[in-house]
Amino acid sequence: KEKLKKKSLKNWTVAAADNRFIPVKNNMAHTVISGWSISYIVQWNFHIWEKELNKVFDEINRILQPGGTILIIETLGTGYKTPFLRDEKLKLYYAYLEKELLFNRTSIRTDYEFGNIDEADRILRFFFGDNLTDYIIKEKNYMEENNHIIIPECTGIWWKNSEKAT
């Protein structure tokens, strides 16, 4: 935020908010980007996930200008070299994005690099918890390259243009 302020640009907004209640005016955004956050609406509200997810997209569409773009970034598997989901909730969410909301999808690798296995274990355990870290470290789902530990990560990128009339 401070870097943007120093550039004297006036066409940007940064805010922390619930995806279901975004504190900005209608039709103000050319692009809405959500990184690793909408999935938590599904995870934390699974008994009513479709209703809550629709609130998110109603809100995104409210703030998006006609012809604008929605870009969603989410995990497609930590500890895997190719996209793979162990989580059934995420599978439902991603299928909903693609089949019901008609988002396009691609995937990229976004691997993590650590100086040694102890550093990898400590940071992964803090961020991802014991189950996933144990799976990665104990099952040796990592690579050693140039004295570094590489943890594979696949990331999904979903996008679509606004359906609002211009």
Spell out what each predicted region is:
Residues 7-10, 65, 98-100:
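Short, well-ordered coil/turn elements that cap or connect secondary structure elements
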Residues 68-99:
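Conserved class I S-adenosyl-L-methionine
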